[in-house]
Amino acid sequence: MILSFIILGILYVLFLSVLHYLGIGYIPLAIIASAMILAQWYFSDKIVLWTSGAKIVSKDDYPKLHEIIERLASKNGIPKPKVAVVNTQVPNAFATGKSPKSSLVAVTSGILNLLDDDELEAVIGHELTHIRSRDILVLTLASVFSTVAWYLAQFGFFGGIQSRNRDSAGTTVIVIVVAVVTWIVSFLIIRAISRYREYAADRGGAAMTGNPDKLADALLKISGKMNNIPTKEIESVQKLNAFFIIPALSGNSIANLFSTHPPVEKRVAKLREMKTGMGQL
């Protein structure tokens, strides 16, 4: 985890040094791109509510869900987040928000119908761990320069098309190459960080409930059910894959190769090991 951030830091310093050496005046573009990604983080709960179609629900409508979230949040010193439900048969859950004081936990109607109370509690524990660890902030900061690099590559490409000056065109090519390499390496490192955060949230959620087996059972149920959901339904929620406890992907999807989440089998194996370590066998 720390090594990933060190590599990212070195990469970004080299990237900016090359731009400075070439005398590229892309600072305004970098500022704009950074502002956009930080605004996305600041309004993350509202953006996700809008894109997911999640609806904030009251305690009267979902008493059991509210009780689980309130109890676990109080037990772990976390302010109770807003509670939302997404009307889809895809079984899943996610958390978002810029801080523990401004956060949201959402579950789908599919997961409410699939899991028993203990399994649902384990999933909620996983999501509350994301909130407690400020994972949205961590991944946002890690993503800033990768977003800047992407915009610079696009800007350099379109700027190069319009330029007829050979020197300018040569500089543009260098900028595009450096920006693309930065983006690719950042992309891979950010996914490594994300997978680490998922393992950490599994451990944290299991520790919250004291029952790693239930989270393992929930993950297996969710992934198993996902294979039986119509493709159209899966595709309708894939924009939320980075947030979901398990990405909504078909089993043979090439997207699994670049997933933000570790394979379910490995997560389950680690949870079973955690159970052994807790002396539950």
Language-model features and meaning:
Residues 45, 107, 122-130, 134, ...:
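Active-site recognition of the HExxH zinc-binding catalytic motif
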Residues 1-94, 142-199, 223-227, 277-281:
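Hydrophobic or amphipathic, alpha-helical segments that drive membrane association/targeting
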Residues 52, 116, 120, 129-134, ...:
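Active-site-flanking alpha-helical
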Residues 73, 78, 91-92, 105, ...:
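Intramembrane catalytic core of multi-pass membrane enzymes that act on lipidic substrates
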Residues 64, 119, 140, 196, ...:
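Alpha-helix N-cap and coil->helix boundary residues
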Residues 78-102, 165-167, 205-281:
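Active-site-proximal gating segments in proteases and membrane effectors
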Residues 57, 109-122:
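Short pre-active-site segment immediately N-terminal to the catalytic Zn-binding motif
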Residues 128-144, 156, 213:
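Catalytic Zn2+-binding segment of zinc metalloproteases
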